[in-house]
């Protein structure tokens, strides 16, 4: 996560709304929870979701502190204040299960090794968005949960010829 934790991020967003001063690494677009965190918590019911993914997301939100009403309301809504708590609770659940969530961290490059015909990621170059220093992080499996505003990351992946497909 190139931005800050949601509870730190709110300070940067409030400062922007009050003064117009933008923190490029922590704002409405960047930080834990992404752009949706400050969208006032309106949810899409995904009625036409044949695979039930939307329903599963709503259940996860409810399990982490959102009103259970979102599971049956025609226009589900969490609200920004509650959504920030839900996101914090989700982070806590993930870390309790062993997830390593690194804040102020931007993947700026990938290194690969060969496994026969296949390329496998072996190392990430990670830049600390607060200090500008970089470090190498060995990796066998990587989940890149990239928000829509991280165009620089998409450009790096394209340059590295990482297969991607549109949403």
Question: What is the predicted function of each stretch?
Answer:
Residues 1-167:
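Residues forming the flavin
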């Amino acid at each position: 996560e190139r931005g800050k934790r949601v509870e730190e991020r709110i300070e940067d967003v409030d400062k922007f709304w009050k003064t117009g001063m933008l923190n490029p690494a922590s704002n409405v677009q960047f930080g834990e929870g992404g752009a949706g965190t400050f969208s006032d918590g309106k949810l899409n019911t995904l009625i036409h979701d044949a695979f039930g993914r939307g329903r599963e997301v709503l259940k996860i939100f409810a399990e982490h502190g959102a009103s259970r009403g979102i599971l049956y309301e025609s226009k589900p809504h969490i609200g920004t204040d509650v959504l920030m708590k839900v996101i914090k609770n989700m982070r806590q659940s993930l870390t309790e299960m062993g997830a390593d969530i690194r804040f102020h961290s931007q993947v700026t490059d990938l290194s690969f090794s060969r496994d026969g015909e296949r390329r496998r990621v072996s190392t990430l170059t990670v830049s600390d968005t607060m200090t500008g220093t970089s470090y190498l992080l060995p990796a066998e499996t990587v989940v890149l949960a990239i928000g829509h505003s991280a165009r620089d990351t998409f450009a790096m992946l394209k340059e590295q010829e990482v297969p991607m497909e549109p949403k």
